[in-house]
Amino acid sequence: MLRVRFAPSPTGFLHIGSARTFIFNWLFSRHHGGVMILRIDDTDVGRNTEASLTSIFEGLRWLDLGWDEEYKQSERLARHREMAEAIFQKGLAYRDFTPAQSGETEKSGAQGTWLFNSEMRHLPAHESDRRASSGEPFALRFRVPRDTERQVRFADSVYGPQSKSTADIEDFALLRSDGMPTYHLASCADDAGLEISHVIRGQDHLTNTFKHVLIFEAAGVAAPQFAHLPLLVAPDGTKLSKRRHGPVVSVTTYRDAGFLPHAFVNFLCLLGWSPKDDRQQMTRQEIVEAFSLEGINRANTEVNFKEDDPFDPKAVWLNAEHIRALPVEDLAERLLPIVRTAGFPVDLPKMLAITPLVRERMKLLRDVLTVADFFFEEELPPYETSELIPKKGDAALALAVLEQAAWTLASTGFSHDGLDAALRSAAQSMGIKAGQLFEPVRVAVCGRKTAPPLFGTLEVLGRDTCLRRIDQAIAKLKEL
C-alpha cells in the first residue's frame, strides 16, 4: 500500500514551505487511496521545544486535512539503534572516539568539498572494542566506501535521475556519542519500519538522500521512492526564512489574518504544482483528483509579497473567491468569533443576516470588522457632513431628502421589499432620482458612501437605529 509521511521537527513554528510539503503528501496519499502519516522527528532533544510542537499541531489542524497515523521518533529509539547495530556488525560503520570539537576534515573529490575524515576509520577492531568496553564515549559513523569510487544513484520523481560519487560523501554519523540517533539514521530506520513507500520532501534534502540510499543498502532494505519539491523563495530569490522575512513565512500568520484553511491549501498547492489546465480556484476534492507528482515544477517558486503588503495577491484573491463560494451559514459561523473577540456581543441570527450583505466586499475574514463595523457599533465613527450631499445636489436637498426618508421609514413596514418600494416612491414624490435619495440615507445610516446593499442594511439595522442615525445626520446638516 502507498504510505507517505510528513516529518516535522519541533524546533520552530510551522513554515509555509513545510505546510506545502504536508499538503503535497496528503494530496498524493488521498489521490492514490494511501495512508498519510504524521511523524514528529524529535530526536534532537537539545533543540526541541514544547512551544514549537504546539505551533506545528495548531497549524496542521487549522489546515483541516488530517492524517491517518501518528508517531514520535523519540518513542522508536530502540529501532534506530537496532538498525545502527546491524550496519556496524556488517563492518559498514565504525566507532569514532574523536571528541566532537576536534574532528578533522580533508578536501577531496571532484567537487573539492571539505569532508569529515577520522583516523578512527582505520582503528583495529580489537582496539575499538577495548576502548568501548572501558566506557570511552564514541559516535558511530557510516563507513562510506573508499576503496573503489562508485556512484550512488536514485531516481527522483521530480528532478529525475540523480548520482553522486562516494568520494564526495563524508563518513556521516549514525549515532551521537550520547547514544542518540542522528537525523539520517532515525529517518531511514523509521521510513523502513513504517513501510514508507514514497518520501516527498523539500529540495534542500536532496543531498541528504545520497546518504540515505547508502543506509538503506547497508541495512538490506528497499529504499522508498523519492520526490523532492522546489523551494519557496522571496521576490529577491532568497529562501524564505523567519529571520529574514518575518511572520509572513508562518502558517499561523495566515490563520490569524483571516484566511480560510481550504483557500490557503488551494494557494499553497499551486506554488510549484499545476493541474495541467488553467484552473486556479479549486475545491479540495478537485485538487485531490488532479494531483500528481508529474505536475510539480523543478524551478523554485516565488511567494510574491512586499514590505508594506505581507500577503501574496494571489493568496488574497483566492481567499476572496472561496469566501464568496462558502455557504452563508458556514461563513457566518466563522465570522462570529472574530466579531465577538473584537468586543461586539453579536448573536448568530444577526450574523446570519449580515453575512450575505458583506461577503462580496471581503477578502479576508477579519475584513468583517471594517466592512460591517456599523452593524456592531452603537455610534458611527465621525464622517464629513459634505458626504451627505448627493450628486448634483446641495445641503438643502440633502436635508429635505433625509427628512422625507425619516418620515417614510417611520411609517412603512421594515422588510427589504417594503423599504425598496417605499423609498423609491418617496424619491418619485420629490421629483428626484432614486440615487439622490439613497446616497444621503446610506451615509446617514452607515457613515460612508460605499456600503452593502441599502435595503438589506436598513432591514438588519432596524427602524430605531436607522431613525436615530438619520436624525443625527439631519442635525449635522442644520449646523452648516
Regions from the PLM with identified roles:
Residues 1-113, 208-221, 263:
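N-terminal Rossmann-like or analogous alpha/beta NTP/dinucleotide-binding catalytic cores
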Residues 25, 56, 87, 91, ...:
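Residue-level signal for inorganic ion chemistry
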Residues 416-461, 465:
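Helix-rich, typically C-terminal accessory recognition domains appended to large enzymatic cores
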Residues 4-10, 38-42, 194-199, 249, ...:
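Glycine- and acidic
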Residues 221-382, 446-480:
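Catalytic adenosine-cofactor/nucleotide-binding cores of aminoacyl-tRNA synthetases and other
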Residues 1-5, 247-249, 286-295, 337-342, ...:
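Short amphipathic alpha-helical segments and their helix-coil junctions
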Residues 95, 99-228, 233-241, 250-251:
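Active-site cores that bind ATP or allylic diphosphates and position pyrophosphate for catalysis
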